[in-house]
Curated annotation (Swiss-Prot):
Protein name: UDP-N-acetylenolpyruvoylglucosamine reductase
Pfam families the UniProt entry points to: FAD_binding_4 (PF01565), MurB_C (PF02873)
EC number: 1.3.1.98
Keyword Nucleotidyltransferase assigned: no
Required co-factors: FAD
Subcellular localization(s) per the UniProt record: Cytoplasm
A molecular-function term among this protein's GO annotations: flavin adenine dinucleotide binding
One of the GO BP terms on file: cell wall organization
């Protein structure tokens, strides 16, 4: 007996898992994990499946993290939110704004669960989770022991954290603590946000602008399956960036604190005239080249072949090699996404 994963991944790719368990509390999550381990099955914890590509049928148990709840504590200088890992991220952004607690608005409409946000250190329009993260509560899967990691202990990087490294498959995230400062500072560095006046802008205006940009540029997974940005924006050494800017002076680029330079993957793909290109049922989105979509009953092989094609074209033109932001899941767990498309 197998169970379809199609409803549980936003790419809408039709693979199956041996078992799918919905965990609404910590105990259910732990017992499902321990049961699978006793049976010698691979096991993975999934939020809303908005950042994964299943490459084949999964030979084990998929646990859906549905731990809910939002608690708010107010201090003189901040609001402190303790949020269950299974809460929807965008609903949390709206909840905070509706209750006059700004600070999350740049991260509006990012798909997925709150518990997935620290794994990727989600970010958009100049703000990353690490800016507002206070702590992450986890449970050790083998022992059931609770751990609270401070933001510093999470070792956040660009789309990276300790949860993608040492703690991968060792812990489950059960809640995330956020600190929203009462000294709200708008971040207006990207896209349409640069047109807003920092002196008069409200958090609601930032939220509305972000939602407008995302809905006009990004496809709705309910219409065309996708996992948002398929590739990371590449971060390159300063000399490589200089070389590229000599050849392409209008290339968007964002100097980083450590001297490296972040490039815009979507722009690089667009310059290779790849918008609308299809392989099988997979396509490069026509509005936002960074997004690969399930345009017509795509298989995972179609998506991988298209990602390979995009990576090759960009690499040949710019000598910059893109890496997937989406996580690739094989028969018994995560596999190296770069190797899969190289």
């Amino acid at each position: 007996m197998t169970h379809s994963l199609k409803p549980w991944n936003t790419f809408g790719i039709d693979h199956c898992a041996k078992h799918i368990v919905c965990a609404e509390n910590e105990q259910q999550l732990l017992s499902a994990w321990q049961q699978a381990t006793r049976e010698g099955l691979p096991v993975m914890i999934l939020g809303e499946g908005s950042n994964v590509l299943f490459l084949e049928n999964y030979a084990g148990t998929v646990i859906l993290n549905r731990l809910k709840g939002i608690e708010v504590n107010e201090t003189a200088d901040a609001w402190h939110l303790h949020v269950g890992a299974g809460e929807n991220w965008h609903q949390l952004v709206r909840y905070a704004l509706d209750n006059n607690m700004p600070g999350l608005e740049n991260l509006a409409l990012i798909p997925g669960c709150v518990g997935s946000s620290p794994i990727q250190n989600i970010g958009a329009y100049g703000v990353e989770l690490q800016r507002v993260c206070d702590y992450v509560d986890c449970v050790e899967l083998e022992t059931g022991k609770r751990l609270r990691l401070s933001a510093a202990e999470c070792r956040f990087g660009y789309r990276d954290s300790i949860f993608k490294n040492e703690y991968q498959d060792r812990v489950a995230i059960v809640a995330v603590g956020l600190r929203l400062s009462k000294q709200w500072q708008p971040v207006l560095t990207y896209g349409d946000l640069t047109c807003l006046d920092p002196k008069t802008v409200t958090a609601q205006q930032v939220f509305d602008a972000v939602c407008h940009m995302r809905t006009t540029k990004l496809p709705d997974p309910k219409v065309n399956g996708n996992a948002g940005s398929f590739f990371k924006n590449p971060v390159v050494a300063a000399d490589i960036a200089m070389e590229l800017l000599e050849r392409f002076p209008n290339a968007p680029h964002y100097p980083q604190a450590d001297g490296s330079v972040k490039l815009a993957a979507g722009w690089l793909i667009d310059q290779c005239q790849l918008k609308g290109v299809t392989i099988g049922g997979a396509a490069v989105h026509r509005q936002q080249a960074l997004v690969l979509i399930n345009a017509n009953d795509a298989t995972s092989k179609d998506v991988v072949a298209l990602a390979h094609h995009v990576r090759q074209k960009v690499g040949e033109k710019f000598n910059v090699w893109l890496e997937p932001e989406v996580r690739f899941i094989g028969r018994s767990g995560e596999v190296n996404a770069v190797e899969s498309i190289a």
